[in-house]
Regions:
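Short, mixed-charge aromatic SLiMs
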Residues: 106-123, 181-206
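N-terminal targeting/tethering segments
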Residues: 29-142
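Well-structured core secondary-structure elements of compact alpha/beta domains
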Residues: 50-77, 152-185
């Protein structure tokens, strides 16, 4: 079954509100064909459609979806692709403000841990897809799924590394153990001003097709109807790409 919800690091439950602040403050016309422009980086509608297609293809190939994918599921998956970009910008800015550097080695360590964990989760199925597909499929199977496409797993790993760095920095300043669940409220209090500051500094424009800011809930809510309908050709292309990667081994 296809799900889509926030990042895995459970201690950071303030993320949704901070992202909402970031998206609500940015207006102006969208560039033609753009799904979002985050920190000057343009993501096209076509890119988002391809990402959604790859998720649908992956879950259908592995028999996770009963029946057709609904408009609500498509909308959630499309919004999830944009949310990941906003999360990346937010946590990158927070890390920059704190003077923290997250290296490619940090990203690789995070991604390696994800792959090891998720391949173990899929082990009973003898999953033979790529490492990125393994992470995306395990995500799709979980009840706390974030709508990962295989192609966005490296971005997701980078976000996790950024979150870990910022959380650990704030925990050290407050003399708290970040792994102790009893410290979650205090960590939330420490993180809130850092994220609010970062949210006010990043530049985000999101096409209303993917949702809007709901001031009453401080959340970015998806559009009621989904216009994201990957064509049969797009889904077939995603399937062919996955089959080709399976034949080449993991990566």
């Amino acid at each position: 079954m296809i799900h889509a919800s926030p990042v895995r690091l459970a201690a950071v439950v303030v993320l949704g509100g901070a992202v909402a602040l970031a998206t609500s403050a940015c207006g102006g016309p969208m560039q033609a064909g753009a799904a979002a422009v985050v920190q000057g980086q343009r993501t096209t509608d076509a890119t988002v459609q391809d990402q959604v297609s790859s998720i649908i293809s992956l879950v259908q190939k592995n028999n996770l979806q009963q029946g057709d994918v609904t408009d609500a599921q498509r909308a959630a998956l499309g919004k999830a692709q944009i949310s990941l970009l906003v999360e990346q910008a937010l946590w990158q800015r927070a890390a920059d403000d704190e003077g923290l550097e997250v290296t490619s080695a940090d990203d690789a360590k995070e991604q390696s841990a994800l792959v090891e964990q998720d391949r173990a989760t899929l082990g009973g199925k003898q999953f033979t897809g790529s490492d990125n597909e393994a992470v995306a499929l395990a995500d799709a199977e979980s009840q706390s799924a974030s709508g990962l496409a295989p192609s966005t797993v490296p971005i997701y790993a980078h976000v996790q590394a950024l979150i870990r760095a910022v959380v650990n920095e704030q925990a050290a300043k407050a003399h708290l153990d970040p792994n102790d669940q009893n410290n979650v409220p205090a960590l939330q209090s420490a993180l809130q001003p850092v994220l609010v500051k970062a949210a006010g500094e990043i530049k985000v424009k999101i096409s209303p097709r993917y949702g809007q800011f709901d001031a009453s809930t401080a959340q970015v809510v998806a559009a009621q109807a989904s216009w994201i309908r990957p064509t049969k050709a797009q889904i077939a292309a995603a399937q062919q790409q996955q089959d080709a990667s399976n034949g080449m081994g993991t990566n």
